[in-house]
């Protein structure tokens, strides 16, 4: 089975053609500068092709993707008919969606309804969906929501302590993000430890970071909130702050709320603390050279991640497994060690040699650690492909 995975941005579109059963990627690439001029970067194995192709809209971008997939020289399939389904990443499903679903007119209307909750991403995701429908009208399309995995949270975790009408009228609550990644890691960890019923905290640590408290494969709590700004500090996001900080800055510097939120999203986090970079590799190098601001950034990040792990361990009444995933979680042994240094009270013990691993699926705790600590590389595209295949195959029965 071939599933085409689409992640549409406002002026870009990422794609992969994948076998959901094996995880093999036949081809992948990126369309960028949509609406401006258009450029396609297409990869098959180690071979990369870059083409300038006019892309006035997302429809032309999708057409360019399909053309190169069936190209006699650069392609990997003979006909578009060999694509069995399309899986779309959709950022915000609001309270409308608790799982992936086959796209129809009602689903599109519901995604449109969620635009106020995901004003930057949902319109772009819809453009990708409509573009695929236009050029592949007979191919099943599936929406996979970044928020869906977290919809199993209980009210005590997702409700904000603000007047009830804002929840009832405007759906203001904790939603959480990176759900497809958390779902994949939870599923894969269950396979690795050989059981379905256990308690874990997954640390998705990258330029954007979030944690999820998971019991028996279901999310009980997560660190991001109504938006991806909440939780631990990130590459350029502040993470949790006192809401009055916004009022103070806006009043003192005559700044609009929108401009203040842009600052909190794009000019804060590790970039602001270090004054150097949002890239954790740069922070590590700076810390080694004695840059105190880089040291502080790493200490702040590790401290906040550990605080969330401890809080979620309390919420779950203990945990069996702690997992690290995404760019920093998979590759940065220093950050993992700094986080776990705080967790000795839980019986967490890292093996220093095993913790040197980068991007490999493996246990990094000692045999006598009371909590198993794993590195589990995420694969959101595979999760999207598997969800898509499962829904499409079920619909055929």
Label the model's feature ranges.
Residues 3, 12-56, 225:
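Short glycine-rich, Thr/Ser-proximal phosphate-binding strand/loop in the N-terminal lobe
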Residues 68-83, 189-194, 309-320:
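Phosphate/pyrophosphate-binding loops at sites that engage ATP/ADP/AMP, CoA/4′-phosphopantetheine
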Residues 69, 73-121, 142, 149-157:
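Short beta-strand-loop/turn "lid" adjacent to the catalytic site in phosphate-handling enzymes
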Residues 149-252:
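Glycine-rich phosphate-binding loop of actin/hexokinase-like ATP-binding domains
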Residues 215, 220-256, 262, 326-357:
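Catalytic phosphate/nucleotide-handling subdomain of diverse soluble enzymes
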Residues 262, 269-273, 280-315:
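Adenine-nucleotide phosphate-binding core of ATP-dependent small-molecule kinases
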């Amino acid at each position: 089975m071939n599933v085409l995975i689409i992640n549409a941005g406002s002026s870009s579109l990422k794609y992969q053609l994948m076998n959901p059963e094996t995880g093999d990627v036949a081809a992948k690439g990126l369309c960028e500068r949509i609406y401006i001029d258009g450029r396609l970067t297409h990869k098959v194995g180690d071979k990369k092709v870059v083409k300038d192709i006019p892309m006035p809209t997302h429809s032309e971008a999708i057409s360019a993707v399909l053309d190169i997939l069936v190209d006699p020289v650069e392609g990997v399939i003979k006909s578009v008919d060999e694509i069995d389904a399309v899986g779309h990443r959709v950022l915000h499903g609001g309270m409308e969606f608790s799982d992936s679903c086959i796209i129809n007119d009602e689903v599109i209307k519901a995604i449109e309804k969620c635009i106020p909750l995901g004003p930057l991403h949902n319109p772009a995701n819809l453009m990708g969906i409509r573009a695929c429908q236009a050029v592949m009208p007979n191919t099943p399309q599936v929406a996979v929501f970044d928020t869906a995995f977290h919809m199993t949270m209980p009210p005590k975790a997702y409700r904000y302590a603000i007047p009830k009408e804002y929840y009832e009228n405007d759906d203001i609550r904790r939603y959480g993000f990176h759900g497809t990644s958390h779902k994949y890691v939870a599923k894969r960890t269950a396979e690795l430890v050989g059981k379905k019923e256990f308690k874990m905290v997954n640390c998705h640590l990258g330029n954007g970071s979030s944690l999820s408290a998971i019991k028996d494969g279901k999310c009980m709590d997560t660190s991001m909130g109504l938006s991806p700004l909440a939780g631990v500090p990130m590459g350029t996001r502040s993470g949790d702050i006192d809401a009055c900080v916004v009022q103070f800055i806006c009043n003192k510097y005559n700044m609009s709320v929108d401009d203040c939120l842009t600052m909190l999203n794009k000019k804060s986090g590790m970039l602001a603390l270090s004054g150097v970079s949002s890239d954790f590799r740069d922070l590590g190098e700076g810390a080694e050279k004695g840059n105190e601001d880089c040291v502080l950034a790493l200490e702040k990040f590790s401290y906040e991640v550990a605080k969330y792990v401890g809080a979620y361990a309390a919420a779950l009444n203990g945990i069996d497994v702690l997992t690290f995933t995404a760019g920093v979680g998979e590759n940065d042994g220093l950050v993992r060690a700094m986080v776990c240094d705080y967790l000795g009270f839980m019986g967490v013990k890292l093996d220093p040699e095993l913790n040197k691993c980068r991007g490999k699926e493996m246990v990094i705790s000692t045999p006598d650690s009371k909590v198993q600590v794993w590195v589990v590389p995420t694969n959101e595209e595979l999760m999207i492909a598997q969800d898509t295949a499962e829904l499409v195959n079920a619909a055929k029965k």
